[in-house]
């Protein structure tokens, strides 16, 4: 069984037992959270698609850790104008373990 959930403005296809890195969620490590924005639920050849959400569906997950992704380097330059700008960015994330899918 799998589900498509929306969190942090992004969509993820998840199944029970998987680990997933999502945008940072303000929850303690070890806390159980419920992702209730379920867009679709599937099992085998059956697929239930919401309009826009599947009613009564939820995904239960446990927070494993919080962290930061690798640095992304941004470099801007204007040729012949002696303008250069360097910048770096590290995005925060929360790692989840998907416990169960309730459909």
Curated annotation (Swiss-Prot):
Membrane spanning residue stretches: none
One GO BP annotation of this record: translation
Pfam families membership: Ribosomal_L21p
Sorted UniProt keywords: Ribonucleoprotein, Ribosomal protein, RNA-binding, rRNA-binding
GO terms for cellular component: cytoplasm; ribonucleoprotein complex; ribosome
InterPro entries noted in UniProt: bL21-like, bL21-like_sf, Ribosomal_bL21, Ribosomal_bL21_CS
PROSITE patterns according to UniProt: RIBOSOMAL_L21 (PS01169)
GO MF: rRNA binding; structural constituent of ribosome
Quaternary structure, from the entry: Part of the 50S ribosomal subunit. Contacts protein L20.
Family (UniProt): Belongs to the bacterial ribosomal protein bL21 family.
NCBIfam families: L21
PANTHER family in the cross-refs: 50S RIBOSOMAL PROTEIN L21, LARGE RIBOSOMAL SUBUNIT PROTEIN BL21M
Protein task: This protein binds to 23S rRNA in the presence of protein L20.
Cited HAMAP family: Ribosomal_bL21
Name of the featured protein: Large ribosomal subunit protein bL21
Taxonomic lineage of the native organism: Bacteria, Pseudomonadati, Pseudomonadota, Betaproteobacteria, Burkholderiales
Name of the gene encoding the protein in the UniProt record: rplU
